[in-house]
């Protein structure tokens, strides 16, 4: 079985693949201060009896990645391991001004989106940031857009407005909020829906083609049911990309 690890700024998602099927997955908080030993103890507890035969990792948090590397070498010694970083063979041409700026998670999403849906495609990843990644018909990474994630926007508003507070992120009864809580929920949910729909429409116009869209990330379910432009939901798109890149780097050439 293959262990895939996607280290994000807020959460780390782990998945275990049996062949090309995702057998199990977990979401835990990312703690850049966690040591390799602590991570090994946590991951072994989650994995239980899953017989791990390889590891594939991507990270947007450099401090966490250092300890993940140590954890893998101690907990899964001598196993085939792929860490996605500049120079890793992904099969994805990166057509931006500085290819080294492209986050590993964005390249994994590009790889998986083209594998599953072909192209052109637009990936919208709802996490700490809302990342929009554009994939060409040939599977090239063309760039995209960043916006604050829903939780980041809510935290910022609650911290700067004296009479506002964090609320549960759920769809309110109506767009017109009848309480402070509902007004916040409306602004957060429908605000992001409008933002994403507007960006997708502009990107499609710039591409000159009705590119398919794929929503992923932990907060995608909140948005996709209200969106007019999000066609598909792949909750584990990044993990699928990690499986594909592992295969590209471990299969005999």
Swiss-Prot record:
Annotated binding of ATP, by residue: 6-13, 128
Residues the entry annotates as binding substrate: 103-106, 180
EC number: 2.7.1.33
Record's catalysed reaction(s): (R)-pantothenate + ATP = (R)-4'-phosphopantothenate + ADP + H(+)
Pathways involved: Cofactor biosynthesis; coenzyme A biosynthesis; CoA from (R)-pantothenate: step 1/5
GO cellular component: cytoplasm
Pfam families assigned: Pan_kinase
Binding site residues for K(+): 125
Main subcellular location: cytoplasm
Record note on cofactor: A monovalent cation. Ammonium or potassium.
The protein's enzyme class: transferase
Similarity remark: Belongs to the type III pantothenate kinase family.
NCBIfam families membership: baf, PRK13318.1-3, PRK13321.1
Protein name from the UniProt record: Type III pantothenate kinase
Source organism phylogeny: Bacteria, Bacillati, Actinomycetota, Actinomycetes, Frankiales
